[in-house]
Amino acid sequence: MSRSGLPAVVIDNGTGYTKMGYAGNTEPQYIIPTAIATKGIAEDPRCRARRWWCPWAAGKNIADLDFFIGDEAYENSKVYQITMPVRHGQVENWTHMEQFWEHCIFKYLRCEPEDHHFLLTEPPLNAPENREYTAEIMFETFNVPGLYIAVQAVLALAASWTSKQVTEKTLTGTVIDSGDGVTHVIPVAEGYVIGSSIKHIPLAGRDITNFVLQLLRERNEKIPPAETLEVAKRIKETFSYVCPDIVKEFKKYDTEPDKWFKTYEGIESVGKKPYNVDVGYERFLGPEIFFNPEIFSSDFLTPLPKVVDETIQSCPIDTRRGLYKNIVLSGGSTMFKDFGKRLQRDIKRAVDYRIKRSEELSQGRIKSKAVDVKVISHHMQRFAVWFGGSMLASTPEFYKVCHTKQQYDEVGPSICRHNPVFGAMTM
């Protein structure tokens, strides 16, 4: 704990949801949509051009305080304009981001920021300027005593140590982080992200929801117009799973429809009338876009297992075995039943085929050692990034690597361009 004796605050701002809470806890205290509802007043063009926090907005008027975040933002969508301050993992509107953090700290966590160190997360390849903007808001607006900005992939690796599959605490591995808006495949070696090998996949939870909705509409399922997206999302989260073979799965449904088809029961939010939605092939076709993306999009056609294999193959050769041996899942869109099992099988097939071909081409002169492929699933997978941050921020070393307010005052925001890796975490 800090000198005040209070735990650090951990906030993970995702594209779809923000997770926040105090270090040392196993789950975030609050999980809210990363959305803000404002009166739609035009943003100062100087802010928009520089994507900078507005220091001249320090003297707030009533309009500056008239906003809602999270679920309350959607509840007030008829009167207020909803915007997403984070898109594809990156902060797009720093004015709204500052307002969002303000409510997170004072309304939800109900803490005095001057008394708590803060751990915030960032996506891979985040621009150093973004760290400066974050530091400026945290140190100047909220006057926090200490700040650490952690890479989400490293935190996800740390969270995987809770899995029974993990026999060795290591910060070397491949993180597949799939949330609501974006999916990243991130190789990490000894706590450092191999930036040149990161792969981005334009498919994530929101795309699965839209695909499920598309399939329901094609079958003319009667869903209240105002609730179509929410119903598709609930069907995805309740009934979807990953199948081992899509052709065999179709046959199962056609042979035994009573066994495999499900029914979603809902109540209209306006008329309060009950309604039913039949759920069929959507159960396995939704998550299947990760493994056969051509069924959903003609723009991106590379299956996730192939992307993971290509990512690891592009890394330095001495790191590859460690990256194959520790493939860690993170994010809500990796929570589908048998997701890890299917992914491990497909990656293993690709690796074994390459070894077999190399032996054939060398006419048996080269004998390769088998590569161990292991995909790690664990019970903290959905909140892996936040939980990893909670673990690290509860260690004494966290306070040693934090950038302090005193250092910020002496050096300026550039001090937060670099955040040291926790060296003693794996001990």
Swiss-Prot record:
Keywords: Actin-binding, ATP-binding, Cell projection, Cytoplasm, Cytoskeleton, Nucleotide-binding
Pfam families listed in its UniProt record: Actin
Biological-process GO terms, alphabetical: phagocytosis
Chief site of localization: cytoplasm
InterPro entries, alphabetized: Actin, Actin/actin-like_CS, ATPase_NBD
Keyword Mitochondrion (UniProt): no
GO cellular component terms listed in the entry, alphabetical order: actin cytoskeleton; cell projection; cytoplasm
Domain of life of the native organism: Eukaryota
GO molecular function ontology, one term from the record: actin binding
Localization per record: Cytoplasm, Cytoskeleton; Cell projection
Main function: Functions as ATP-binding component of the Arp2/3 complex which is involved in regulation of actin polymerization and together with an activating nucleation-promoting factor (NPF) mediates the formation of branched actin networks. Seems to contact the pointed end of the daughter actin filament.
Subunit description: Component of the Arp2/3 complex composed of ARP2, ARP3, ARPC1B/p41-ARC, ARPC2/p34-ARC, ARPC3/p21-ARC, ARPC4/p20-ARC and ARPC5/p16-ARC.
Family from the record: Belongs to the actin family. ARP3 subfamily.
PANTHER family reported for this sequence: ACTIN (PTHR11937)
Name of the protein: Actin-related protein 3
Organism field: Acanthamoeba castellanii (Amoeba)
